[in-house]
Swiss-Prot record:
NCBIfam families: lipB, PRK14345.1. Catalyzes the transfer of endogenously produced octanoic acid from octanoyl-acyl-carrier-protein onto the lipoyl domains of lipoate-dependent enzymes. Lipoyl-ACP can also act as a substrate although octanoyl-ACP is likely to be the physiological substrate. This is Octanoyltransferase. Keywords: Acyltransferase, Cytoplasm, Transferase. It holds the Pfam family LplA-B_cat. The gene is lipB. Gene3D superfamilies: Bira Bifunctional Protein, Domain 2 (3.30.930.10).
């Protein structure tokens, strides 16, 4: 395997968003240059709002809370304690296979949730992973995806709602979606599931896609 996993910090050692972004860019440059293997960063962020390239002004926090503009796709979202973040920085085997990459990210998260009895699905026309409307409520998003591919190497990634407070979402139009809500693995199961609880399973599931996704650079560490 040439894919590396690096756990930067989980509760209580939250990672500042800008610190994590700087590290992403540094690793991205090295992967592009063939100086480092493809790497997946795993962490929990300190609380922050981030705005993708498609964010509109009316979707920003209603109380004027600062927002970090980022170069990923998608719109406005929140990251913070209780949410597992994974930033795959991968040299894609198929540069044109971005849709396949996104679908694999969704499949990885769905497989992890199945272990906890959560019936998560994808919804046509909407990125991320969802719980369909049931007696608990309307359609609700349980995991988000926002990526960028530059020089054939991915950045940004996924956010899985494990045990995070949903109050910050009340201040924004999350991901530009007005007709659905958000949820967490803990809410769906009725028991506390923290990011640290699912890391090993996430890594295991992600590793199954290594050969299909990742191009092995010449001289990569084996």
């Amino acid at each position: 395997m040439t894919l590396e996993f690096s756990q930067l910090g989980l509760a209580p050692d939250f990672v500042d968003y800008m610190q994590g972004w700087d590290l992403q860019r540094d690793i991205h440059n090295k992967v592009v240059a063939g100086e480092k293997n493809s790497t997946v960063l795993i962490l929990e962020h300190a609380a922050v709002y981030t705005a993708g390239k498609l964010t509109e002004d009316h979707e920003r926090p209603f109380d004027g809370t600062p927002v970090v503009p980022v170069d990923r796709g998608g719109k406005l979202t929140w990251h913070g304690p209780g949410q597992l973040i994974a930033y795959p920085i991968l040299k894609l085997k198929n540069r044109a296979g971005i849709r396949d990459y996104v679908e694999r990210l969704e499949a990885i998260m769905i497989a992890v949730m199945q272990d906890y009895g959560i019936k998560a699905v994808t919804v046509k026309g909407r990125a991320g992973v969802w719980i369909l409307a049931d007696d608990k409520g309307p359609d609700r998003k349980i995991a988000a995806i926002g990526i960028r591919v530059l020089d054939g190497v991915t950045m940004h990634g996924v956010a899985i709602n494990c045990s995070n407070d949903l109050a910050p979402y009340a201040q924004i139009i999350a991901c530009g979606i007005t007709d659905a809500s958000v949820t967490t693995m803990s809410l769906e199961t009725g028991r506390t599931i923290n990011p640290a609880d699912i890391v090993d399973r996430f890594v295991e599931e992600f590793s199954k896609h290594d050969e299909a996704l990742v191009s092995t650079p010449e001289g990569a560490l084996q």
